[in-house]
């Protein structure tokens, strides 16, 4: 075929050009091209042979390795996808004592009791949370922060008992370790006990790390549990100063702890006298018609104002709603252990004298 293209046409005579035999020259060119073509084919074949041989070596082992790595990756990463799995389930414990039978026929009392499923950390109080509008007109929830505290908390308990009514007490963990007997009185009277951090730190303070914020929450839970003799508090929490850092709201949601804001802030910590507490609460309540009221059993003026405030609530046709958690919140063992480093042993004995000193002879 090459010869037919590069040689003489069929029947053509050889010609000479300037003494050169064109037939001979044509033959030499043709032979050279044939040899060049043969070498090219040989080299190309060798190259294809090397390429074909290299492909199985490079590609075949790589595919199983990649597949194995891909298959192993989800198994390693799976536990991190469910952070709440690290938290213990709610503890099983004896039911809380019921409120004492009411002997006051004119008492404010408790109109209804609601049980809260705290799964996912629902929020209550329209100052921050608008989703769960469960209170009916003229319904009120009484809440008290910062206790327990000598004199003031017992005075609040007496005012509530006199009116056969109840509230939620958000206890500071450190205060609970100072006054465990008072907190036990709160529980024994049938009131709901939530938590309010370990030391009342503002969790929006940028100087606090995330670990420190979590410690404030968790050590507060551990402290209240310790003060109650191993009884876990309700899965209810209120942020100090109503400062809600978003990452801690998420954390409490994973912890299945409900968050409480308020509808009516009494600003009792600013009040110069008991009457001011009553005036502030009733003015806001008459405007809104219902709501969660924020007060402090830590404050002297609140304890003094509460008997008259409860009278005003009854006279105004308001009704008290009791809130309780469907389940308590479990403390975390690492914070239970950490708490033991900070608990201050009581310096005053709570035992009766005759249990300590016994006359054996006279």
Question: Predicted regions span which residues?
Answer:
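Active-site-proximal beta-strand/loop segments in catalytic clefts of secreted hydrolases
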Residues: 144-147, 170-174, 197-198, 238-242, ...
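Residue-level detector of anion-binding/catalytic polar loops
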Residues: 166, 192, 258, 265, ...
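Divalent metal-coordination and catalytic microenvironments
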Residues: 145, 160, 193, 237-240, ...
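Alpha-helical scaffold elements lining the catalytic groove of polysaccharide deacetylases
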Residues: 152, 201-229, 243-289, 302
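N-terminal pre-catalytic segment of deacetylase/amide-hydrolase enzymes
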Residues: 23, 28-33, 39, 43-143, ...
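Short, Lys/Arg-enriched N-terminal segments with co-localized hydrophobic residues
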Residues: 10-26
């Amino acid at each position: 075929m090459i010869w037919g293209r590069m040689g003489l046409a069929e029947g053509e005579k050889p010609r000479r050009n300037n003494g050169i035999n064109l037939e001979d020259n044509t033959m030499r060119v043709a032979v050279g091209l044939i040899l060049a073509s043969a070498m090219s084919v040989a080299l190309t074949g060798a190259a294809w042979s090397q390429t074909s041989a290299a492909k199985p070596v490079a590609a075949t082992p790589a595919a199983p390795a990649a597949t194995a790595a891909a298959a192993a990756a989800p198994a390693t990463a799976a536990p991190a996808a469910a952070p709440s799995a690290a938290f213990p389930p709610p503890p099983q414990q004896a039911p809380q004592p019921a409120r004492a039978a009411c002997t006051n026929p004119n008492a404010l009392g408790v109109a209804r009791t609601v049980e809260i499923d705290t799964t996912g950390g629902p929020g209550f109080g329209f100052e921050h949370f608008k989703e769960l509008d469960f209170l009916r007109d003229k319904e009120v929830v009484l809440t008290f922060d910062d206790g327990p505290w000598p004199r003031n908390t017992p005075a609040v308990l007496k005012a509530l008992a006199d009116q056969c009514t109840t509230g939620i007490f958000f206890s500071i963990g450190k205060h609970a370790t100072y006054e465990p007997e008072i907190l036990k009185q709160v529980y024994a009277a049938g009131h709901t006990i939530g938590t309010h951090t370990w030391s009342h730190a503002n969790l929006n303070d940028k100087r606090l790390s995330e670990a420190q914020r979590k410690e404030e929450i968790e050590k507060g839970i551990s402290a209240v549990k310790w003060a109650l003799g191993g009884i876990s508090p309700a899965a209810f929490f209120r942020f100090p100063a109503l400062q809600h850092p978003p990452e801690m709201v998420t954390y409490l949601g994973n912890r299945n702890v409900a968050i409480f804001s308020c509808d009516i802030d009494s600003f009792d910590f600013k009040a110069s006298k008991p009457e001011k507490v009553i005036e502030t609460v009733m003015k806001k309540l008459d405007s809104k018609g219902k709501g969660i009221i924020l007060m402090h059993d830590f404050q002297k003026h609140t304890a003094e104002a509460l008997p008259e405030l409860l009278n005003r609530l009854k006279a105004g046709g308001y009704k008290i709603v009791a809130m309780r958690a469907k389940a308590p919140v479990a403390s975390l063992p690492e914070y239970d252990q950490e708490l033991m480093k900070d608990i201050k042993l009581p310096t005053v004995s709570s035992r009766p004298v005759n249990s300590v000193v016994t006359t054996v002879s006279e």
